[in-house]
Amino acid sequence: MTTKTSCGDFVQFFRSWVSDPLRVAAVAPSGERLARLMTQEIEPLDGPILELGPGTGVFTRALLTRGIPESALTLVEFGEEFAVRLRGRFPEARVVQMDAAQLGQCGLFEDAPFGAVISGLPLLSMSPAKIEAIVGGAFETMKPGGAFYQFTYGPRCPISRSILESLGLKGTRIGGTVRNIPPAGVYRISRQNPLEISTGGSKYRRAEDNTGIGAYATEAGKADMGRPEASA
């Protein structure tokens, strides 16, 4: 299965960027080389896998190429236009339309912990409180040894040292590519002590409550829970 981006995907992505540049934060979908970097450490036994901000599904296809069953994927996407296409393109995956900042509060992911999280979210365009809510919530849904993979267009880890330390996490750069628009680096975020579950939950919940973000989750057949500010 190829991870190359079709012309139709590019057009949809570009239109979404034009309509909401802060939410999409890139003029084109991620490239094939970046998709390989983002998923290079993922193995079939790591499932189930959570993907945040999958957009047109570039990283999703790379996960399938790595041998992850489609049924083991949960795709969290805020944009309705992307969520609709993802449901049609990956019918066996669980597609949830929601703000990723609500991961630790929505109660949708308590049935089985994830082995890893792949994030295509534009963290550089988000507030520190929102980043902490997303990352903290993601680690609440993960197995103790799970890792959070994030790419960035910046020169350093997009999650600040203060946020990492408050959640008991560490960031490690695992690669980069100039063959992407724009060039990007990839970081693995993991627990400082894999045997301990992050204890930062109450802190990041309070931070997000102060920003007035409400819960929002729409899955095929599920009702709205209130619309938040834009994220993925």
Where would I find each of the regions flagged by the language model?
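Glycine-rich SAM-binding Motif I of class I
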Residues: 57-61
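A short acidic, Gly/Pro-enriched loop at the edge of an enzyme's catalytic core
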Residues: 106-117
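Conserved class I S-adenosyl-L-methionine
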Residues: 46-55
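SAM/dcSAM-binding transferase cores
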Residues: 10-17, 40, 161-232
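Class I SAM-dependent methyltransferase Rossmann-like catalytic core
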Residues: 6-44
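A short glycine-rich, Lys/Arg-flanked "PGG" loop and its adjoining helix->strand segment in the class I
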Residues: 132-144
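Conserved SAM/SAH-binding beta-strand->alpha-helix loop
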Residues: 79
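Conserved beta-strand signature within the Rossmann-like core of class I S-adenosyl-L-methionine
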Residues: 142-153
